[in-house]
A protein has these predicted regions:
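FMN-binding flavodoxin-like domain, especially the glycine-rich phosphate-binding loop
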Residues: 13-16, 23-34, 46-158
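Conserved SAM/SAH-binding loop
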Residues: 36-39
Length: 158
């Protein structure tokens, strides 16, 4: 299975999570993690599992991730297993975050994520983090679960 992780990262926290996910799924197949760049469109050709990750800014994905989602065609995503994650503060005041919004946008394009969006947490009220203890390990666990779910829901990936 070929896994492609597209992420944005402002302070390195989302990148650390993306790399932990890539490192974990490499045990099962090919995996690469790339920083989203609006100036360089990405191709999903040959991708089986697409994972999108963004820090939460103003309860939504970064502008670069919004640009990617706003400019990719639903046809380009057809047949892919897709999942979303974000990094954010933990707290009751945070009603929304980037990953659920990305998943919602995918649904409006006719693409159903194979698993609920996941949030990984940074130290409270510090934009630059660091990630809370155990979040990188939790990302690896999530990646294994996600990979298993992708194989079960997309038989061609076995």
């Amino acid at each position: 299975m070929n896994t492609f992780i597209v992420y944005d990262s402002q302070f390195g926290n989302t990148e650390r999570i993306a790399q932990a996910i890539a490192d974990t799924v490499r045990a099962f197949g090919q995996a690469s993690a790339v920083h989203v760049d609006p100036a360089h469109p990405v191709s999903f050709q040959g991708v089986d599992l697409l994972i999108l990750g963004s820090p939460t800014q103003g309860f939504r994905p970064t502008l670069a991730m919004q640009f990617l989602l706003g400019n990719v065609s639903s046809q380009a995503l057809r047949g892919l297993a897709v999942a979303c994650f974000d990094t954010r503060f933990r707290g009751r005041l945070w009603k929304s975050s980037a990953a659920p919004r990305m998943a919602r946008q995918l649904r409006t394009m006719g693409v159903e994520p194979i698993i609920q969006p996941e949030s990984f947490f940074v130290k409270a009220m510090k934009k630059e983090g660091p990630l809370l203890a155990g979040e990188v390990e939790r990302a690896a666990t999530w990646a294994r679960m996600l990979f298993t779910k992708a194989q079960a829901s997309h038989p061609a990936m076995r």
